[in-house]
Amino acid sequence: MVHDGNLYAAGILRTETGENYNKGVDGVTPLIAGVTTPEQTQRLLAHLTSQQELFTPVGISTVDQSAGYYYDNGYWNGSVWLPYQYFLWKSMLDLGYGEFAEKIAKTALHAWSQETDFSYNTFELIQIESERGGWFHQFSGLSSPLVVWYHSYYKPGNVTVGFDTWLEEWHFSNDYSSARIRYKTSRVGGLLLAVMNEEYSDYSVTIDGEPAQFVQRIPGTLEIRLSQWQGEVIVQAK
């Protein structure tokens, strides 16, 4: 952003050739803040999901790959950082984009596993060009999002929501074939992930006694759409 002499916003900061200097992951952070209009949400998602722009085989790039100032082997520019993947993943749950949320998580888990299987190190970042880890090799703080993703999709008894939903309580049966979850949310239409027993292929889900919309993209992991501001979710194997 360029400011005038009175420090008021005067326009977009651009390169010498006129290109927007904010064509990077920072430019989609309004999605994380939850302040976008429906039209803005769709425009930002188009940049975020495009494989020619921000989405790469190892995750969401820090800088748009189509930008004139993109560099494919930098420390920040040209790399994937897991904390940003985490923030945007949580935001996708808020927005109700479960398929893309899962893609973010699975891509990060694969990229990390690929490097760790090879080197047994947890690096600061994943470089897009080489798909290898880079810089400090014992950066354990960045492993926390990976643990969260794994638990959110594969650990029975786990419940996950976005930033805008509060879990009041949750209880699972001993064999994870049923669950009772109470929540409050400031965003109707967001998602709740509940990891159940994958040995049961069919489940019923209600919110305050009414049938709820849900899908299973991963066996046993239910992606439940929250249709009201607060309620009690009941999950039961059939």
How would you label these PLM feature ranges?
Residues 56-82:
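Generic long, charged, amphipathic alpha-helical segments
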Residues 7-51, 74-178, 185:
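C-terminal capping/lid segments that line or modulate ligand- or cofactor-binding pockets
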Residues 12, 215-216:
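Short linear motifs in exposed loops
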